[in-house]
């Protein structure tokens, strides 16, 4: 009898729950179909409120964007975990969002919950925009021409040492999970060039574990619940505290021994002062160094992996790279001297290969800004409400046949007769030196506007030296009859090749190994 009553109660509750869910879905559909405000951008149709288009967007953002553009045009809104995300695609969309006025759009409210626990307090998105612009200026002036020139031999040595000592490249030929290998190479090159000798010496097993635990803090759920007591968040917080301690120890040691100063990024930041006269606090220096390590390594690791995968899928291009170096750099047509900064400008195919891979494989597919005031969209009847989030996707123009014929094909040679010029009329100073707004171009691998990446020049130097060194010493190829490259993994905040991404390798000169 008791069992029967329990079952009846359960059935009744289930019926009420089902009816309630059905009512919510019906009301959601009616609102979409009957009550649309004509000044609102079109809303992507969805069945379930709150969830909206979260799944389809998360599985393949670019497929989602292109599909929606066919149905709704360049401007549309979709629901992402209860948030109203207004997407504006194309060059005009990039301009509207990435060069939006500070009073109208805000990046800090979007990214601070995600980045502050990883990078640290009082920097980047955890401070007023004016302070961030000063911090970007400090970093930018640490990336001087002389500094970039000095980085080339350091980066080349790190790559050569890795090829000689890593178990991934033991012997004269083999197979390698290339995303793991490039993650290690890029953290070593960036660590040595940007972080200084003390930090590079600390890139041991402990530092790798700390980096891994911090990196796992960049998970989509932390956009919504950065404080959630998840195991990965506890590890993230512990890793941040330990990494900050490491940098603080280095800074304190240098202050005790000023005669041993070396001209690297830590030295540069230790001598920086805000406009109000306050020296850059040591805690902020430590947090900025963590940011440099994390932010730069993500994109370099991803794009260098894609480069190696593309070269493995088309070995003939790898040979073209090698022959370009022989033609342009070899004194005798056989041997190659150590790389120098000026050599990179003599290798157009190397540069074009990097550009083309960046075009196809941007690691960040969505750039978001919180709307602070209603924003009329020029040339349209739409007004973006203040409770929306704006989303720009520069990768969409880079993947469009309108701007790049046969855009889905990887072709480094397409850049030989193409020049991407900065619009001199759009030069602006946001507080960290003059830059181009950049949004008039369909190719924006490093973003645009006040939040444009300041590490662009270093990224090209780092990738250029890595590619040139690999081409000198290695041959790459696909294995097991595989064609092309792996699919893109969009499950993390920074997209990259799906794993496992295994390719074959052999040394170009095995007798020298």
UniProtKB/Swiss-Prot annotation:
GO molecular function: heme binding; iron ion binding; methyltransferase activity; sterol 14-demethylase activity
Superkingdom of the organism of origin: Eukaryota
Known catalytic reactions: a 14alpha-methyl steroid + 3 reduced [NADPH--hemoprotein reductase] + 3 O2 = a Delta(14) steroid + formate + 3 oxidized [NADPH--hemoprotein reductase] + 4 H2O + 4 H(+); a 14alpha-methyl steroid + reduced [NADPH--hemoprotein reductase] + O2 = a 14alpha-hydroxymethyl steroid + oxidized [NADPH--hemoprotein reductase] + H2O + H(+); a 14alpha-hydroxymethyl steroid + reduced [NADPH--hemoprotein reductase] + O2 = a 14alpha-formyl steroid + oxidized [NADPH--hemoprotein reductase] + 2 H2O + H(+); a 14alpha-formyl steroid + reduced [NADPH--hemoprotein reductase] + O2 = a Delta(14) steroid + formate + oxidized [NADPH--hemoprotein reductase] + H2O + 2 H(+)
Gene this chain is encoded by: cyp51A
Family assignment from sequence similarity: Belongs to the cytochrome P450 family.
Residues noted as binding heme in the record, renumbered to the chain: 453
Pfam families according to UniProt: p450
Organism: Aspergillus flavus (strain ATCC 200026 / FGSC A1120 / IAM 13836 / NRRL 3357 / JCM 12722 / SRRC 167)
Gene3D superfamilies: Cytochrome P450
Annotated glycan sites: 37, 406
Main localization (coarse): endoplasmic reticulum
Protein's UniProt keywords contain Lyase: no
Keyword Oxidoreductase recorded: yes
Protein name as it appears in the record: Sterol 14-alpha demethylase
Function: Sterol 14alpha-demethylase, encoded by cyp51A, cyp51B and cyp51C, that plays a critical role in the third module of ergosterol biosynthesis pathway, being ergosterol the major sterol component in fungal membranes that participates in a variety of functions. The third module or late pathway involves the ergosterol synthesis itself through consecutive reactions that mainly occur in the endoplasmic reticulum (ER) membrane. In filamentous fungi, during the initial step of this module, lanosterol (lanosta-8,24-dien-3beta-ol) can be metabolized to eburicol. As a target of azole drugs, plays a crucial role in azole susceptibility.
Subcellular location: Endoplasmic reticulum membrane
GO biological-process terms attached to the record: methylation; sterol biosynthetic process
Cofactor: heme
Membrane-topology descriptor: Single-pass membrane protein
GO cellular component, as recorded: endoplasmic reticulum membrane
Protein EC: 1.14.14.154
Effect of residue 72 to N: Leads to resistance to voriconazole
The entry's keywords: Endoplasmic reticulum, Glycoprotein, Heme, Iron, Membrane, Metal-binding, Methyltransferase, Monooxygenase, Oxidoreductase, Transferase, Transmembrane, Transmembrane helix
Enzyme class: oxidoreductase
Up-regulation conditions: Over-expressed in azole-resistant clinical isolates.
């Amino acid at each position: 009898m008791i069992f029967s009553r329990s079952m009846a109660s359960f059935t009744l509750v289930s019926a009420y729950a089902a009816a309630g869910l059905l009512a919510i879905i019906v009301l959601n559909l009616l609102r979409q179909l009957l009550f649309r405000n004509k000044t609102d951008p079109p809303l992507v149709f969805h069945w379930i409120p709150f969830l909206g288009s979260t799944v389809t967007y998360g599985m393949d953002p670019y497929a989602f964007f292109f599909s929606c553009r066919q149905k709704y045009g360049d401007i549309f809104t979709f629901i992402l975990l209860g948030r109203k995300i207004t997407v504006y695609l194309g060059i005009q969309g990039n301009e509207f969002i990435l060069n939006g006025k500070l009073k109208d759009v805000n990046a800090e409210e979007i990214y601070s919950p995600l980045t502050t626990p990883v990078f640290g307090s009082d920097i980047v998105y955890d401070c007023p925009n004016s302070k961030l612009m000063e911090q970007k200026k400090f970093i930018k002036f640490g990336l001087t021409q002389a500094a970039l020139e000095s980085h080339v031999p350091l980066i080349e040595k790190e790559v050569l040492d890795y090829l000689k000592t890593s178990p991934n490249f033991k012997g004269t030929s083999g197979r390698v999970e290339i995303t793991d290998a490039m993650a290690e190479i890029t953290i070593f090159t960036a660590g040595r060039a940007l972080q200084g000798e003390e930090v590079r010496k600390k890139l041991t097993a402990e530092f790798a574990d700390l980096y891994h635990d911090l990196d796992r803090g960049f998970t989509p759920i932390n956009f919504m619940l950065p404080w959630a007591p998840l195991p990965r968040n506890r590890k993230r917080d512990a890793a941040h505290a330990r990494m900050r301690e490491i940098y603080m120890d280095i800074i304190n040691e240098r202050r005790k021994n000023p005669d041993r100063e070396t001209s690297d990024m830590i030295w540069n930041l230790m001598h920086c002062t805000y406009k109000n006269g306050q020296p850059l606090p040591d805690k902020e220096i430590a947090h900025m160094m963590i940011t440099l390590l994390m932010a730069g390594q993500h994109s370099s690791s991803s794009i260098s992996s894609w480069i190696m995968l593309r070269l493995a899928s088309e070995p003939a291009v790898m040979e073209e790279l090698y022959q370009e170096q022989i033609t342009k750099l070899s004194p005798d047509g056989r041997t190659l001297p150590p790389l120098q900064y000026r050599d990179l400008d003599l290798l157009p195919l190397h540069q074009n290969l990097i550009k083309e891979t960046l075009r196809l494989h941007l690691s960040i597919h969505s750039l978001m800004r919180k709307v602070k005031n209603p924003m009329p969209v020029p040339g349209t009847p739409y007004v973006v409400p203040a409770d929306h989030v704006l989303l720009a996707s520069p990768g969409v123009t880079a993947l469009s046949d309108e701007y790049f014929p046969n855009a889905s094909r990887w072709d480094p040679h397409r850049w030989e007769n193409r020049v991407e010029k900065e619009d001199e009329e759009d030069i602006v100073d946001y507080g960290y030196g003059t830059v181009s707004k950049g949004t008039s171009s369909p190719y924006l691998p490093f973003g645009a506007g006040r939040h444009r990446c300041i590490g662009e020049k270093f990224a090209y130097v780092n990738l250029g030296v890595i590619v040139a060194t690999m081409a000198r010493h290695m041959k790459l190829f696909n294995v097991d009859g595989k064609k092309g490259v792996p699919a893109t993994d969009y499950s993390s905040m920074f997209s990259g090749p799906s794993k496992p991404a295994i390719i074959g390798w052999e040394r170009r000169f095995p007798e020298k190994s």
